[in-house]
Amino acid sequence: MGVRVFSTDHQATSWRAQWLRNLNAMPDADAAFRSLHAFVTPLGFEYYAYTLRTSVPITRSHAVSWSNYPEAWLATYAARGYAECDPVLQFCQRGVSPLLWPQADKVGESDASYWADARACGLRHGWSQTVRDHRGIFGTFSLARSTERITEDALVVVEPEMIWLAQLVHATISNLVVAQLLPDAAAPLKDVERRTLHWTAEGKTVAEVAAILEMTERNVSFHIQNAVAKLNAANKTHAVVKAALLGLIPAIG
């Protein structure tokens, strides 16, 4: 597989520390993604991709992708509308287990054309991993190559590094774009506003929240309305849903 394997914990720690320093120095998401080439090659792969999906707005969530995939594949992917039925993204939305791309003889009928086109464009063997963070952002990181099948024995050696890289890529790139894609994730909610939304999310009425937090119903309504405004929500229900999906509740303490 042509991968770099570390013989000691100290070597692995130094390697990861260097990656962290390099990525943390990147000025934007595009630069951070381009820099991954130097990290991916030692793992034995030619191609890599990262797709970020937000959890809000629920009916029109944002999706942004970066890749160094062959131009032929990017053109085919767009022309055939594979974004709507991508089996990699569909699998990765259902969980966070790594996905080893299927071999030609193990592809389901519904996905046959997708994988045939991918292989024809040089993406013959690959692996994908999804990471989900506290803001409800999903990030799917993929590694691929045109030759040499990825064996189970090889994965035992290198997959821990691949999983760690997926987590690092997600943390780095999502942090660089979150202010643009999810400005409400940084909504300056006060602790009392979080607590009122927290108990509202549990189905409590204003009167019940007031009793729990030992304040007047008027104050509860006041704090909820402030939270609605800060989250750019349409109403109380919308604010609770957004706060939950963005990891702003439950309130701690």
Spans of features found by a protein language model:
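Helix-loop-beta substructure at the N-terminus of cytosolic sensory domains
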Residues: M26-S61
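GAF sensory/regulatory domain recognition
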Residues: L52-T76
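Helix-to-coil/beta transition segments that act as allosteric "coupling" elements at the rims
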Residues: A112-G136
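Regulatory sensory and allosteric helical modules in signal-transduction proteins
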Residues: S67-S110, A116-R119
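Basic, Lys/Arg-enriched C-terminal extension of HTH/homeodomain DNA-binding domains
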Residues: A229-G253
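Recognition helix of helix-turn-helix DNA-binding domains
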Residues: T205-H238
